[in-house]
Structure formats: structure tokens, C-alpha cells
Amino acid sequence: MKKLICLFAVFLMLCGRAFALDANDLLPPEKAFVPELAVADDGVNVRFRIADGYYMYQAKIVGKTDPADLLGQPSFSKGEEKEDEFFGRQTVYHHEAQVAFPYAKAVGEPYKLVLTYQGCAEAGVCYPPVDTEFDIFGNGTYHPQTDEPASAKDRFLQPSSQNGSGALPPPKGDEGGDSRFKLSWDTLNANLLAFFLAGLGLSFTACMYPLLPIVSSIVVGDKKAGKARAFVLSVVYVQGLALTYTLVGIVAGLTGALLTVWLQQAWVVLAASALMVVLALSMFGLFNIQLPNAVQSYFQNQSSRLSGGKIVSVFIMGILSALIVGPCVAPPLAFALGYIGQTGDAVLGGLALYTLALGTGVPLIAIGTFGGHILPKAGDWMNAVKYAFGFILLAVAVYLATPHLPYYLVVALYTLLMLVPAFMLLVNGRRQKRRPKAVAFALGGILLIGGAWFGWQGANGKTTALHHFLTLNPPAEAGKSSEHGKMFADTAALKAAMDTALKEHPDKPVVLDFYADWCISCKEMAAYTLNQPEVHQAVDMERFFQIDVTANTPEHQALLKEYGLFGPPGVFVVRSDGSRSEPLLGFVKADKFIEWYEQNR
């Protein structure tokens, strides 16, 4: 951790105390997080009273109404930055959180408000998302519909998870989405480098070649310019180009909170995935995305009227050039904007797109400074760059849709995304000259071997680190064995498997572990405890059962209630006579886990 490491260390120490934590020490969610409403003419203000030792996630606070769309964009009170190893930087609240939901339109009739929120206990237990419903009346009063949180089946908003089971992990600067690719201040250098390299890649597509005459005119406009002057003018031109991209990035960052809420819905995620496929097809040349000819001509005429050699004129040329070339690079730019939008940070968004523009502008600066003779000649290699971006966009489409697709279909799609370009490189490489042919054969061979290996491993149920990374989770069949035992999402299948194990060996207990994707301590247990060799030596992992309650279905809620839990993690030793141990709550290290198990087996 780079910042807040002391706070995070305190958090881990509190989690470590969970070995002595009793389930009775935890408050039910309706007492840990208590919403109070103030209904005004212009909106609804919500104040959450948060019990000591608990905290809430800002990005998990959502308001929905019936009739729909009565509320505008919410504003939040200032929260605290919490750094999490698994989910990145989070904004959380202790003690109190205030949210203002303005009305988006006139409200004259009573309506129903559903507040969705989620939080955790500092001791290491996370609660499932809670829905609380209120009837709002026109005279400024309100009434809770029930004393209990709304059930999952009554939700207006059904968050989607990264394993397809239904609930989104805690916000990533936010789950959403996904912690594998997160733009945050802690990963700023790596992310800016990635955006710079992406911009550099875009500069080698045919999209940027219309800008070369403009760059040449910049230098020609100052006939006495040496290389130093030409360099300065080229840099100023690229800064104008970058300004347009930066403003777009800022807008994407400002709308990030809205994108986060929308991206929790399956249909939005799948629509975004379909859009990536369409954009990829444009990179393969099936159709072109461009401004109407009349609009393009207007911007080109305005640019040509500006005289070269003058700083202000050159800067404005750069701005207009971004508008000319922008639609041509729309497919990869659309992905970049969606990626930035998850941050909700205007500064980060602006920095990311500014860096992308700088990468795009490097060859333009080189051309303006040293002349066009250093530019590679146009040819098939430019199409190869476009095709590469097309396959990247297809991979992004699969990545977005992964939580909603069967495991083996995801494996098959990724396999095709490696094998198809491999065959294209191997077939087309034969027509190239010696050096391009060698490069094409090398890349094609790597992709061919990698694709065949990835597909074979996935088809045989052998999940490697790459499979976990790309597919988010191993096959979701009930009872699939892993290094963490047997994972179930269906409670009936879990109970049947546990009953069978206890009947076969009544003298041996089984272990039941409650898990969820949005549970930080569950991730810690998986990463630092359950995968340790000493745990596998002490515990028979064939008798270790995990129930994935990420979806928080009514069946999951009933099972949690049956075992006296408000949320995961919770580990029990269950015996053949029907008795079970007190739960192990929160994160503990391997030695403490083994000690607890030996005491309760």
C-alpha cells in the first residue's frame, strides 16, 4: 500500500481479532446502517446512522423510484479513502453518511423509494446488499414499507457479479468492475504508460495519416524555422490535439458515478459488449465510422485558413485536427472512455486521455521536426495494426460479457481469439518479405501454441492462473473441486453433498465456508489462508465445502439465517449428529485457522 497503509494495517489487525469474535457481537444490517429521510420540495435527503465498528461504501448507495426516473444524480457528503488490496481505492463512511437525491422532474403524486446500500463490519464480515423501501407522500412525509429490508426478488436493481451469480463486488474506486483493470491513483504510472502506448499504437493506423499534411504546413508556414523551432511548433500542435482528448476524458470521469450504477445491470453490460463487437467489425473494414463529409470539409477548411508558424494558430489547428480524426479512432477511444468512466474522477480521466493523445502525437512531432522521410511507407502493415485493435476490442467484448456467459463458452471464445489471428499471420506471412515474414511467423506460432494450450486446458477442466484471470472463475458446476474445497452456488446441491459426505464417513466432520465476491475478508482467506500447504495437510479439502452467496438469493439468505450469519465470511465444522461449531468469523491466518479447526473437529 502506498497511501493509508497505516489505516489498512489497523484494518488487518481488527480482522485478525475475528478468531475470538462471536456471531452475537455483530449487529443485524438494519441496526448497523439506519437510513433517515428528510423529504423536501426539491428532493430527498438521506442520512445513514452507522454503528461504531462498521462502515458503508459510497458507490453502493443507490436510490430507485417507482414510478422510475424521478431522481437525478445524487451528491454525497465527503467520505474517507480506504485502500483495499483486492478491490482498490474505496470511498467509505464511518458513523454517518449523507446523500442528497434531487428530483429530476416535478413530483406531484406519492411514490415508492428503494434505497440500496452495502457495508461491512471492521471485524471482517461484509453484509450482502440491503434494499429498504419507503412510501413517499406529497406532504413531505414518508413511511417505511416494512421493518425488514426488501427481499432480493423485490429489487428494482439487480447488480451483476463477476462470476455471473448476481451481486457486484464492492466498488472499485468503483466492482465494478473489475479489479484486474482499474484506473486509480495507486496504479497511475502503469495506467498512464498503458494509455501512452495505446496512443502510440493508434498513431500507426491510417487514421493519423490525414494529419501529416497539416503538420507539414505548420513547419512550411515558418520558412526560417530550424529543427528547434519546428520541434516547438509540432509540440504546440500536439498540445492542441491533446486538449480536445483531455476534455473528453474529463467528461467521462465526471459521468463515472452514473456509469457505475448503469454497469451494474446485466442488459447494459451485454449491450456494451455488443457495441465492442460492432466497433471491432469497423476495424476489420466492414464499415467506416466517420463524420459526414460536409462536417469534415468544414473543419478542414477552417484549419487551412489558419497560418502556420504562429503559436496560437498552430494550437487551434491541433484542436480542429482532433475533430477531423476523432471519428476514425472512435472504436478504441470508446473502450478507453468506458474504462475511464468507472473511476468517477475527472482529473484521472483527463490525465489518461491527455497521455493517450501524447502517444498519438509522438510520430507527428517526429515528422514535423525531422521531415517526412522518416515515416514508414503506407502498406499492409497499417491494416495489420487496425486488425490488431479489432481483435483487442473483441477480447474486451468477451471480457465484459464473461460474468453472464458459461465458463466453457468463454474459454472457447478466447481460444478463437488466439487461433484466428494466428492462422491469419501464418497464411499472410508467406507473402511478405523476409523480416516481416519472420515476425508474422513468430507471432502466429506463439498465438497458435498459446490458443491450443488454453483451449485444451480449459476443455479438460484444468484451470491455470491465466484461466482464472480471463474467465474470472473456474467452471461453475456444483461441487467442482479446487484448492479451496468444493464450491456450490445452489443450496440444495450443497446440502445433498454434505449429507452424502457425512453418511459415508460419520466419524469425520465436514467444513462449511460461506463466501461472496463482494466480501473482502473472503478474498483474504482465499489468498492467504485456504491455499496454504499446512492448511491442506490439516484439513481434508474433499470434505471442505464452500457456498457462494454472492447472488444473495432468498435461498442464500435463508441459509445464512439458518447458520446465524448476517453475511460472509463464516466457517463452521459440521458433524454427522447435526451439531456444528461456533463460527469462525473474519480473516485469520493459517496457524489460527488450523488451531480453530483442531479445537472443533
Swiss-Prot record:
Residues 1-20 form the signal peptide. Its EC number is 1.8.1.8. It is an enzyme of class 1 (oxidoreductase). GO terms for molecular function: electron transfer activity; protein-disulfide reductase [NAD(P)H] activity; protein-disulfide reductase activity. Belongs to the thioredoxin family. DsbD subfamily. One of its GO terms (biological process) is cell redox homeostasis. The keyword Cell membrane applies. Residues 467-601 form the Thioredoxin domain. It is a multi-pass membrane protein. The keyword Cell inner membrane applies. It comes from the Bacteria. GO terms for cellular component: plasma membrane. Residues 148-176 are annotated as: Disordered. The gene is dsbD. Keywords: Cell inner membrane, Cell membrane, Cytochrome c-type biogenesis, Disulfide bond, Electron transport, Membrane, NAD, Oxidoreductase, Redox-active center, Signal, Transmembrane, Transmembrane helix, Transport. Residues 213-242, 288-310, 368-380, 428-437 are cytoplasmic. It is found in: Cell inner membrane. It catalyses: [protein]-dithiol + NAD(+) = [protein]-disulfide + NADH + H(+); [protein]-dithiol + NADP(+) = [protein]-disulfide + NADPH + H(+). Disulfide bonds join 120-126, 207-328, 519-522. Its main location: membrane. HAMAP family: DbsD (MF_00399). The lineage of its organism: Bacteria, Pseudomonadati, Pseudomonadota, Betaproteobacteria, Neisseriales. This is Thiol:disulfide interchange protein DsbD.
